UniProtKB/Swiss-Prot annotation:
This is Uncharacterized protein ZK1307.1. Pfam families: DDAH_eukar (PF19420). It comes from the Eukaryota. Gene3D superfamilies: L-arginine/glycine Amidinotransferase, Chain A. The lineage of its organism: Eukaryota, Metazoa, Ecdysozoa, Nematoda, Chromadorea. PANTHER family: ARGININE DEIMINASE (PTHR47271:SF2).
């Protein structure tokens, strides 16, 4: 294998997940407002059906799903993506901006320790909301969102996880408060992204590093299409992907599997929010 082929294979491997963690929505409700999307009454039966549909889609794509029980009084614990950022057998722990979610932190810490995942960041003061604001497009490139939730300075400490480039992403729209609401890596040269959510400099960097990226429409962004999970040749997304985007992804060898996430969108989350990537 040539050097270029080896590099491409290493990059592509980032989208072949080994396993993920999910939290069943036993106590999922909308009890407070900490983002612009929150509101409405959750249909608990429907939420369970949607969660199970997402779990099945992930498993059918070949990725095992581990589960962690939800604790009563922590309705947003289902959005386990925000628990930390995992790299190999290490995790940089989250520190939530809003007090309503701070009770989740010791539960995640306990789970990581029980599962022999080395923890970094325990006791640190910098605000960081895990995989919601930080995602690898390949093993050597971390996209690092900051603004509404995570602090810019935290990424200096996240370097302790390993050797990789950190691409700072300046997020400028309150409705797209986490990076995973407006940016989703698809493969080694492309991502789904919503340009208005980013500064001009960040948009330029996305296209420089991921030149085949797909700019989604406002309607798609509001449907949380960028809150997607790519596993090999499957892009698992909330309902709302346009035909143009499906065609573009198809041309790149990807098929779209849409999953109804309407109950979770009442709390400002969807597919990617419900999953912690255990690389």
């Amino acid at each position: 294998m040539s050097d270029s082929e080896t590099m491409s294979a290493a990059k592509s491997a980032a989208h072949i997940l080994k396993r993920v963690l999910m939290v069943p929505p036993k106590h999922f409700t909308v009890e407070y407002t900490i983002n612009p999307w929150m509101g409405g009454v959750v249909d608990k039966q429907k939420a369970h059906q949607q969660w199970n549909s997402l779990k099945s889609a992930i498993e059918n794509a070949g990725v095992p799903v581990l589960t962690m029980e939800q604790t009563e009084g922590l309705p947003d614990q289902v959005f386990v993506c925000n628990s930390g950022l995992v790299y190999d057998d290490q995790v940089y722990l989250s520190r939530f901006r809003h007090k309503e979610r701070s009770g989740e932190q010791p539960l995640y810490l306990e789970w990581f320790k029980k599962n022999n995942i080395k923890t970094i960041g325990e006791g640190y003061e910098e605000i960081f909301e895990g995989g919601g604001d930080a995602v690898f497009s390949d093993r050597k490139t971390l996209w690092a969102g900051y603004g509404e939730r995570s602090s810019k300075s935290v990424y200096e400490k996240i370097k302790a996880l390993g050797t990789f480039d950190i691409v700072l992403c300046d997020m400028i729209l309150p409705n797209f408060y986490h990076l995973d609401t407006c940016f989703a890596p698809v493969d080694e040269t492309s991502a789904l992204y919503y340009p208005p959510a980013f500064s001009e400099a960040t948009n330029k960097e996305i296209l420089r590093r991921l030149p085949n990226s797909i700019a989604v429409s406002e309607a798609e962004a509001n449907a949380f299409v960028c809150n997607a999970i790519t596993i090999r040749d499957t892009v698992i997304s909330p309902i709302g992907v346009s035909q143009a985007t499906k065609d573009y992804l198809s041309a790149r060898g990807k098929r779209v599997e849409e999953v109804d996430m309407s109950e979770f969108m009442k709390s400002g989350g969807a597919c990617q929010c419900l999953v912690l990537r255990l690389l």
